[in-house]
Structures are given as structure tokens and as C-alpha cells.
Amino acid sequence: MIRQRRRALTPEQQQEMGQQAATRMMTYPPVVMAHTVAVFLSFDGELDTQPLIEQLWRAGKRVYLPVLHPFSAGNLLFLNYHPQSELVMNRLKIHEPKLDVRDVLPLSRLDVLITPLVAFDEYGQRLGMGGGFYDRTLQNWQHYKTQPVGYAHDCQLVEKLPVEEWDIPLPAVVTPSKVWEW
């Protein structure tokens, strides 16, 4: 149902909301202070990350994208992403940078990790796509200096999500109209 809501947005609405959210994210203090920021390439009606990526580049931030780990199933690597990066389609039909070990940045060296989500609630819980990739990535985020933040449309807010023991709540979510912090 939430995916249908975001898919129902017109291209013009998507573009406008992507710009609004990017502007809001660029004023979020952890992003302002960051040197390295991991983000994702949006698909399936997700909040458009292209305006954010372009603003991050203009601000001199190093941008990283998630890549499915080739040897450790269910885990992510983060590779440097720049305008000349070669993208390939992964097994989930999502574009990611072509794997080059020289471009990998350890999670502990990421300042901010911007996460996709299907839905979030007023308590910071996020509902992902079901693969558990970000739950595994975020399970020990407090031990790193990495600051996670969700990135979503306003229409992805729900009253309360069911919580499983492996679910990792987010300390913040940025939408086109608001920064939610817990």
C-alpha cells in the first residue's frame, strides 16, 4: 500500500519532492559536518536521490553507494560513486557501481549512511524491502562514527510498525517537509 502511494506520485511531484528533501538533508547537521556520505540510487517510486547526490558532490562530499557483497551473502559494501562511475545491474535489478576493491570504504569510515525504507513510524522504526541488508549493516552503528538517517516521502510515515528483534530503529529520517529525530 505504501509502495503504491509513492508510485502514484507524478514525475513532477517526484522531482519537486526530491529537490525539497535534498535541500533539507543538506542542512541536517551530520551531513553538513560529513566528508563521506553513503546514499542509494532510488527506484520503484523511492524519493529521488539524484538531486541529493548532485548537491553532495557540489558541496565537496565523497559519495558512496551500496553494493551487494560478492562473498558475504546478505551484506553490503560501500563503493565510491562519482559522475564517471560505471554502473551495473545487480541480482536484485538495482544499479550499483561496478565492484573495484580500490573504491571500497569500510563502514567505520562513513560519516553518514542514508538508508532507503518502505515505511517508518513515529518511533524511528523502519520497514525495509525485506532483505535485511540495512538491518545487518546498522546492527552496530553506535560502535562506529557513522550516523544513519532514513530518506523517504512524507507519505511513507505510518502510525506504528510491527517490530522484530533484529529491526534497528533509526535516529533520524528526512522527508521533503521535515527532519524526524529520536
From Swiss-Prot:
InterPro entries, sorted: FTHF_cligase, FTHF_cligase-like_sf, NagB/RpiA_transferase-like
Enzyme Commission code: 6.3.3.2
Gene Ontology BP annotations: dormancy process; folic acid-containing compound biosynthetic process; tetrahydrofolate interconversion
Reactions mediated catalytically: (6S)-5-formyl-5,6,7,8-tetrahydrofolate + ATP = (6R)-5,10-methenyltetrahydrofolate + ADP + phosphate
Entry GO CC: cytoplasm
Key words of the record: ATP-binding, Ligase, Nucleotide-binding
Pfam families from the UniProt entry: 5-FTHF_cyc-lig
UniProt feature, compositional bias: Polar residues: 11-21
Annotated binding of ATP, by residue: G128, M129, G130, G131, G132, F133, Y134, D135, D167
Annotated region (Disordered), positions in chain: 1-21
Protein name (database record): 5-formyltetrahydrofolate cyclo-ligase
Origin species: Escherichia coli (strain K12)
